[in-house]
């Protein structure tokens, strides 16, 4: 129930504020926090760090059940070379991934105030500007010298309300660091920072607290540095980093952060404005970040309609797809990937392709955030949202979540929202076509809709079978095959929530069935 509690926490945030305590000024509190970390001289003496660390990551938006326990993603070894004085870092990631697939991922991310690049077994490439911005912000959040910046700031430091956490009334200071508003929560006894917070937009939860929770303070030189760093979204842990070795002021090679000549022409400065921080950070955690400022499509490309039949359009070109089906007098859309960016594109293109036909239904195959982040856009346009049982209450709550940090269409034009559940089967039928929806047993999520457009014999499947390259037999593809057997589907074209299409007749072994022509 952790993600459900996360959503509920978001609803209560606005109601939980207190008036700031004025007993001490913000600068007095910062002075005390700096002293607790060893003092200004000790912190100024930290010019660089070498860190060996172990990390674990989780994703609440990929839980097995909607609102359930966050999915464990895997273990990571980290080697960090960090030039604190110049705001540069090189981080080597060695990842033993457990989800979304069992694999080993190795790469090095190098970031400076002006650019970033990523190196893996294929070579180096420039990082997107949104990745550079997110990485720089997170380095700043975790930096042991963040308090020094607040201490030296001439403005932008202000007292905030105390906040109760684990039985303590934590002292609070706001610090405007460039374009980032940090909330610093301090232990009332030790004066050490407990939480470094930003307010972020999440594509499902909306207005959110993104917290770095610090503990296990140890001496590094004359300073103190937290050795356990827990990253939490509205109190739900999404990352935990444990420092195993920390060396103060190591020798750093002169070219440690230099960008390779081959990628200099593509170097991008950090993005400004509305950076989708949570999407960038957590897609990197998931091992599925598309390093593109297009967010949903690779550089230089975009979404496109691929016609599977005159009344069936496959939205391809992004990290995840939609399907548009034209009925006699309305449209049905399957899935709502990423967020408003993709949903708005789908709305606009659907209207051009099928003028005069409103989108009446949005069918969500399952609850995972990468396929449902754009749901609220369809809600704002009046579409009825169809979800697999038992997800109705979850999506009704999603509709109520505040989105004021990055206001979306539903926040701007509030309206009643209708969510309907498919327990076993449901169908839409008119004079032109029929769509059958089946809530199928599968290993990926509790509640998964398979959609069958009957006349054209197109089947929509998301995640448990993805037509991109050879399709190997696994628990997901076998679940699709079992559904085909149960409902008598043969000779179909399978359209994927990822990838493109596949012919059922061509992938019989993966489906665990002998396929005959229809």
Task: For every predicted segment, state its role.
Residues 247-250, 256-328, 426:
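Zn-dependent metallo-beta-lactamase
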Residues 306-350, 448-466:
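Conserved beta-strand hairpin/beta-sheet module of binuclear metal-dependent hydrolase folds
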Residues 341-386, 421, 482-493:
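Active-site metal-binding motif and surrounding structural segment of the metallo-beta-lactamase
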Residues 24-29, 35, 42, 102-103, ...:
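Flexible, processing/modification-adjacent segments and terminal tails
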Residues 166-262, 452-454, 461-462, 467-485:
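Gly/Pro-enriched, hydrophobic low-complexity segments
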Residues 28, 32-35, 40-124, 161:
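N-terminal mature ectodomain segment of secretory-pathway/periplasmic proteins
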Residues 481-518:
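Divalent-metal (often Zn2+) His-rich catalytic cores of metallo-beta-lactamase-fold enzymes
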Residues 4-15:
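Bacterial N-terminal signal peptides
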